[in-house]
Design a protein with these regions (language model features):
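Basic/aromatic-rich interaction segments and small domains that mediate binding to polyanionic partners
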Residues: 2-81
Length: 81
């Protein structure tokens, strides 16, 4: 498997989010669940959005291994915190 639970990721392509919203390439997130057959991942993501009170729009999406890369910055944060 490409990733494991709690790995940080960065999307390589835009993917469909919920409510007809598009999650842009470059969006970062965290793996919540991993599936083996077929390989897939549930990822919690946050997208900057000035229209939201928090400044972010949150979504939980399904991604395939070819749609993301491991975010080394997130891994370093976890190791050094």
């Amino acid at each position: 498997m490409k990733a494991k639970t709690d790995d940080g990721i960065r999307l390589l392509v835009a993917v469909a989010g919920h409510y007809e919203k598009i999650v842009p390439a470059g969006t970062r997130g965290v793996v919540l669940e991993c599936y083996n057959n077929p390989e897939g991942y549930i990822v919690d993501i946050s997208i900057p959005d000035p229209n939201e009170l928090s400044g972010y729009r949150y979504d939980c999406i399904e991604v395939a291994p070819e749609q993301f890369e491991i975010n080394q910055e997130r891994l370093n944060e976890l190791v050094h915190s």
